[in-house]
Amino acid sequence: VLRISPIPPLRAAVSAYVELFRNIPVLCLLIFVVFALPEVGVVIDYEPCVVLTLILVSSSFACDNLRTGINAIDPGQIEAARSLGLCFMGIVTSVVLPQALRNVVQPMVTLFISVIISSSTGALVPLAHNELTGLVSRINTTDAMGIPTFLIAALFYVATGLVIAGVGRIVERRVEIWR
């Protein structure tokens, strides 16, 4: 929402944030957060590092998805709200966001599935025993059953993605406007 703000410094700051974190691979950012931040005195446990990395990257994509949903709104809707005397926040909360959120259900579902899949990068830091891919890797190391264990992990990721996509379709049908 701040990317459409009438305050230029806010727009610029959020645009810079989105452009920066949208273009950094999750793995590169995770390595930076885990290994480079302690070099400058910022020490964070591994689990919060993975969560922080996923939040930084996925929130930049969510901002862009929402901006796309906002851009899909007919400008006449906003002009009508202005003519009724609504302030910027009134327009955003009463007119823009309800329509924009309706427009971005599927892109947000896709983003959520992507975040679930990207969480597998957590296996690359000592968080490995708490994350599915890391657990499978440990089982593979101790029992030498690489293909079956990674196949099962892949099936878990596919099943999770299908459940999320199904919930997304239900939500999309619920918020759909029939014309």
Question: What are these regions, as identified by a protein language model?
Answer:
Residues V1-R179:
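Transmembrane alpha-helices and adjacent helix-loop boundaries
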